[in-house]
Amino acid sequence: MITIQMLTDLYNAYVDTFRGADGNLPPMMELKRIHTAQVVANARLIAEGEGFDAETARACDAAALLHDTGRYEQLKRYNTFRDSDSVDHAVFSHDIVKEKGWLDGDPQREAILTAVLVHNRRDVPDGLDPLTEAAVHTVRDADKLDIFRVLENQIATTDWRHDCTAFWNLPTTACPSPAVLAAIREERPVDYQDIKTLADFVLIQVGWMRSGLHYATSRRISAERGHLAFRRNFLHELTDDPVVDELCDFQISACAGA
């Protein structure tokens, strides 16, 4: 069985192939490198909080490390991270890891690869074995927790009112879309095709805090980091629609781990 350190070394060596002559990654790739490190850290917190055994924690750790492996080649080829304009990055990541053979002969190979493959799907497949299911849910939760951080950082460090590139160039002053509001109220995943405004983009993350975070540990971490309060305040900058407080209040019990 390959150690996590050995797998990390292989991953880092692969990422290094995208560095320029100055030794630096392109800025958007560097963001993904940092994101991956944060997802790994989140996965470890979840595994500890949920009391996973060493075998399960190891599969979660490996899957978190590898979940976005394809992002670097995606940006190089297509100059975008938007899957609808390029490739499904989870499938791409799965295929690259498989092609590299990093997990060949590893008894957790299929569990880790499956977690990479489905980490961005709207729904988790049925019929997963316990190890795979734990890896899948942990990576999905850990990824969302860092996506919360990334959004907050983008809002704090960019002129989002005039350059909304990081948010798919969505309108910044339009009200939330009815389809998005309905999905959040019904506690079901939002269809990304229904995201029409920046308010929608932020509200889907509000919805995640109740129906998108699988583990109580993940919901506790989200609450401790103040992610819901940040989104409530930011949404008030985007719209005066009272639905903002309605939906944020709806999440509070779940974010507290209820």
Can you describe what each PLM-predicted range is?
Residues 19, 41-44, 70, 98, ...:
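Amphipathic, well-packed alpha-helical segments that form the structural scaffold of globular domains
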Residues 87, 110-120, 131, 150:
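Sequence-structural signature of the catalytic-core scaffold of metal-dependent phosphohydrolases
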Residues 88, 92-102, 116:
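A generic, well-ordered mixed alpha/beta core segment in the N-terminal half of proteins
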